[in-house]
Amino acid sequence: MSEKLVLIDGHSILNRAFYGVPDLSNSEGLHTNAVYGFLNILFKLLEEEKPEYLTVAFDVKAPTFRHEMYPEYKGTRKPMPQELHEQVPVMKQVLHAMGIRTMEQPGLEADDILGTLAKRAEKEGMDVSLVSGDRDLLQIASDKIKIRIPKTKGARTEVEDYYAADVEAKYGVTPAGFIELKALMGDTADNIPGVPKVGEKTASELLKQFRTLDNLYAHVEEVTKKAVRESLIANKDLAYLSLDLATIRIDSPVVLDWNEARLGELYTEDAYQLFRKLEFKNLLGRFEQKETKQDSLTAKIHVTSDLADAQEIFEAVKKAGHCGFAVLSDQKKCRKIEETEFCGLALCWGEEQIAVLPAEGFLTAQWLCSQLSDLYLAGIGLSTFEIKKAYPALLSNGEKDQDSCGTKTLFDVLIAVYLLNPLKNDYEPEDIAKEQLDRMIRTRKQLFEKLSLKEAYAQRPEEFYEYAGTLAYVCYAAMPVLSQKLEEAGMQKLFDEIEMPVSRVLYEMEKEGVLVRRQELQAYGDALVDRINELETKIHEAAGCEFNINSPKQLGEILFEKMGLKGGKKTKTGYSTAADILEKLAADNPIVADILEYRGLTKLKSTYADGLADYIEEDGRIHTSFNQTITATGRISSTEPNLQNIPMRTELGRLIRKVFVPKDNYLFTDADYSQIELRVLAHISGDEQLIEAYKSDADIHRITASKVFHTPFEEVTDLQRRNAKAVNFGIVYGISSFGLSQDLSITRKEAATYIEQYFATYPQVKTFLDKQVEDAKQNGYVTTLYGRRRPIPELKSSNFMQRSFGERVAMNSPIQGTAADIMKLAMIHVWEELHRRKLNSRLSLQIHDELLIETNRAEATEVAELLKDKMKHAAELSVSLEVDLHTGENWYDAK
């Protein structure tokens, strides 16, 4: 088997990491996000590639031979941001501490070093993986050289791989042809001129026809487009100059003994101390990892399909009193066990006690789930990863407590790590093992690539057992660690009394789903098409020609060149036709108003009329997924499909709600909190004026307008009320004078005056908001009324815009997060009361501040009363929580 060499383009990957990972810095103020992102990519590569050799090449500041050929080379590049620049020497220091060979050479770019080493290694029989964000290196790809282009977003890294065949499949040219493609089309990033009037599409077509640059110029008279032909002839020198500039040198005078690049012990004492200084707590666990630790864990996994053996295991779990478990099923939605591809259970009830029970023979899915459910009913402590997906099994023998969510003995490690670090993009078991237990476990992808669990069990049983057993172990071992951290952070009560119970409520809501009339949805879509076609005809007539309304380029040319409308902003790719540009022109230009309506309707058609139809299941219902661990503020989100962003601004958008209906003999009861965030602000700020305004039970926006604009309450105009409303809600989100000026179409000075007058009216609100910012700067986070933490790393940024964003987050998160917590409490109390009274009505949807119940007609009055009561009394604030309640035959009528 060939040895493997991994080559990394240092500056390129560091740059990708810098822009892909949110701003991070240590307590000394040193920016670290690029280094952190680079290391995550590096570790991922090492785990996937397992190379014998590794080298990282960096660019040097000095000019290269390309600058001698063309002084303007890379002349258009912006300077490296200071926050990134300061991390380059730190990155090199980290690599040196880990014993990783780095290279840089005056006169050469990193690409030339990498290209030379890659081709040399290929000749010597090695397999090569070259990692860079620069697609110029695709010209180096071959059957033995793989170009890997990572994309980093937050802590998540995905990689595109290209061998020679992949380059040709993607770009229609060979790797060698990729250089000639650049020679013709140029490269704005590197300021390679190329041939004027030849873009990527034209260049690709020319190379498909003529194969090479030399052959193209030998037959240049055969180029059919006159303008292109003339440009090619006039700019032949530029074409060949660009070819030279784009060509990576694979014969550079680079000296490297492969032994210098051979990987040794990465986790050295020097590297450990550096990681500590950089405060990479999540990565420190790697220094205590040895391969034997993983081996020792897998050796403890006991696999059995024997009924008697399995019964003994469940008895042992009962005696232990607590276990970690994994339901081995790939279901994406909450379903009955018989509707899922259930493969078995994994249990861990001690450091040495791990069992995997495949669903085969006498160990049927029903029997295994029944045994797990018995553990739950017996009050055994059970911890798992993503509890919602485990509820079908846990509840297969019925309810533990009919009157409550019954989650006191359950622990979801996913929810726990989310509360401790709500800024992560995703949470995986291997991350929990690494961060909480200092253990390395192999990822699902490493074990069986993209196979489903059912496929893995059939094709790679040993890897399946390893995955299942280690997952159960992580759920068992992480629980006490996470519990202690939640306690220390003051979030144990939040976890026990809000997050765990609401997970049960969300499971039931997903399972119930909401009924949708497919025929009415189709009719709604047809009506949209009719109006879209009318608008298209009208727009073309007004323009005097037919064009693609959906093409920003064509639309910009029609509006700002052909029709001569004023206010156009030209960019590199043409005129901007963004909504904010067009909205300013709509009042005076009917065609623009029609275009905006056209855009809105086409979005309604694609996203809702067509999009929702794809999610209607066999039962006629849409079963959305409610996400509990996505938003940093604690709000619940909805996906597949997103039912929380059903349009409300236009009547035609609102009409989509008519297709959502209750089942026969039922109606919808809809309750919506009134101004919950403003009421929360009044309570947590303690502002007496704002509290009194709410206690007066008068129009809060009219009261604010009266006070801010020094106008008697009865004489407040509609405009003053609208402006006061914008200020009221804007303050909650830390709005600036600029933001308010844009919202109200007033000057920045006027907006600043409004805000000053608002704070003069409600001084304790200003004091509260300022204190939130100061506390966040000192602690690194803000908290809700219920203890939920929202970290704000942006406050340590040297970038003014980032810091300003952080300040707005510090002001808003305690308010929005508290409102989200109150809504969750309301959902829990409503759900429990429906069950306590043994009613048939069920919660269907949660949309921000709104709850929708599918209500049995015989229970309508009782449900309306209990829904309003439980929402009003979900929290005891210094101002009352008010609820608007409606009923209807569909969601539209109930709203």
Predicted feature descriptions by range:
Residues 1-131, 135-161, 238-241, 247-255, ...:
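Noncatalytic, basic helical substrate-engagement surface that gates or grips nucleic-acid strands
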Residues 2, 50-55, 100, 123, ...:
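Non-catalytic nucleic-acid-binding/docking modules located in mid-to-C-terminal regions
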Residues 101, 154-182, 300-301, 338-343, ...:
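Active-site-proximal helix-loop-helix substrate-binding element of RNase H-like nuclease domains
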Residues 14-20, 138-143, 345, 388-399, ...:
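Short active-site loop/helix that positions an aromatic residue
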Residues 511, 609, 623-624, 628-631, ...:
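Conserved catalytic core of nucleic-acid polymerases
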Residues 235-359, 378, 451-648, 667, ...:
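Conserved "right-hand" nucleotidyltransferase catalytic core of DNA-directed polymerases
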Residues 346-351, 420, 427-447, 467-469, ...:
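Function-dense linear segments that define catalytic or interfacial modules
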Residues 530, 534-537, 541-593, 760-808, ...:
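C-terminal polymerase-core module
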